[in-house]
Amino acid sequence: MGKGTVVLAYSGGLDTSICIPLLKEEYGYDRVVTVAADVGQRKEEISIAEEKGKRFADKHYTLDLIDQFVDRCLMPSIKANGLYEGYPMGTSLARPVIAEAVVEIAKKEDATAVAHGCTGKGNDQLRFDVVFRAADLEVIAPIRERNMTREWEIGYAEKHGIPVPVDKEKPWSVDENLWSRSIEGGKLEDPAFHPPEEIYAWTVSPLKAPDEPQVLSITFEAGIPVALDGKRMKGADLIRTVGQIAGGHGIGRNDMMENRVLGIKAREIYEHPAANVLLTAHADLERLVLTREEYAFKQSVDAKWAQLAYYGLIYEPLWDALNAFIDTTQKRVNGTVDVRLFKGSVTVLGRSSPDSFYSIDVASFDSTTIDQTDAIGYSMYYGLQARLVRKKQKK
């Protein structure tokens, strides 16, 4: 007697495709239900996953999670200036949303287990596991559990008639969603290897970008981008539009050595044109409307938020507390930021906000609004403790 139904998070790639027969042959499940999530990747990718899921699995679901991804993950990331080790997160933000959708299908299908095709070296295994286990479901990860090699996987796929297009000359792995596109593997694993231009799909080379700059005007309400050049747009549409424009100017490439959750260093290459522009504009607007103390403290909160997001710890109570603080600060992050896009760079040209407490009368060198002699007394005691210690050290 078999083990019933298992629901598999499915991308249509090599790893998740071979999991379908493996879950039956090696794990003894009667039914394998696949779930492909649309989080803004290319439509061709979704179509391939749907076609293969319907062909090889007992049942297949394709779920449109784009709006959910935008509202639950991307907009909060903008409000938190979501950068991990200096780059905009994308994959890490999408995984929990996908995992939660898989859990819902597992409940619907009365499944006894859920599965994913993650390896034992990456971060995604942990992001899926934490959501799956929170739902009290058995978690199966065939690739991780059986320590498979790429060569073995290809052979197994061929044996089961699973078409897997793998180019040995270009064996890099690509993951994309509405916010970012990551490229890794193959020759790219050598940190000294110069990546060929052909790996990029969202951005033109800054060297070949237009010789004329383009200016965008981005309007924010409560920290969320709501309009582009004065035209209000739905979140997903605004992100797509900004991404297409910015990518055409060579903006959003990042080639870096990344510290994974397990401590492994990995060479990762990213494209995130919309993220670069929107995060730059948002951070600049915060400098206009937040107080010095708010701004300084929020930087530490943003860093912790990014770490928890990268680690996939969205059920950590601290996550809710950080989001509550961030939401409070964003009430005044309203206004418009003008940015110039030119050959790979994003430059803020100007910003305005009805919630700004900036006063040109106070800040101007030509203003007499503030009596400068008032600062004399303050200056006398500024750094007092440091001066006293310095004097003692000189004795």
Curated annotation (Swiss-Prot):
Any one annotated GO CC term: cytoplasm
Enzyme Commission number, as recorded: 6.3.4.5
GO biological process: argininosuccinate metabolic process; L-arginine biosynthetic process; urea cycle
Broadest EC class assigned to this enzyme: ligase
Residues annotated for L-citrulline binding in this entry: Y87, S92, N123, R127, S173, S182, E258, Y270
UniProt KW keywords: Amino-acid biosynthesis, Arginine biosynthesis, ATP-binding, Cytoplasm, Ligase, Nucleotide-binding
Matching Gene3D superfamilies: Argininosuccinate synthetase, chain A, domain 2, HUPs
UniProt binding sites for ATP: A9, Y10, S11, G12, G13, L14, D15, T16, S17, A37, G117
Domain of life: Archaea
PROSITE patterns, sorted: ARGININOSUCCIN_SYN_1, ARGININOSUCCIN_SYN_2
Subcellular location: Cytoplasm
Catalytic activity: L-citrulline + L-aspartate + ATP = 2-(N(omega)-L-arginino)succinate + AMP + diphosphate + H(+)
Sample GO molecular function, one term: argininosuccinate synthase activity
Residues annotated for L-aspartate binding in this entry: T119, N123, D124
Pathway this chain belongs to: Amino-acid biosynthesis; L-arginine biosynthesis; L-arginine from L-ornithine and carbamoyl phosphate: step 2/3
InterPro entries: Arginosuc_syn_C, Arginosuc_syn_N, Arginosuc_synth, Arginosuc_synth_CS, Arginosuc_synth_type_1_subfam, AS_cat/multimer_dom_body, Rossmann-like_a/b/a_fold
CDD domains the UniProt entry points to: ASS
Complex formation: Homotetramer.
Entry similarity comment: Belongs to the argininosuccinate synthase family. Type 1 subfamily.
The protein, known as: Argininosuccinate synthase
Organism whose genome encodes this protein: Methanospirillum hungatei JF-1 (strain ATCC 27890 / DSM 864 / NBRC 100397 / JF-1)
Lineage summary: Archaea, Methanobacteriati, Methanobacteriota, Stenosarchaea group, Methanomicrobia
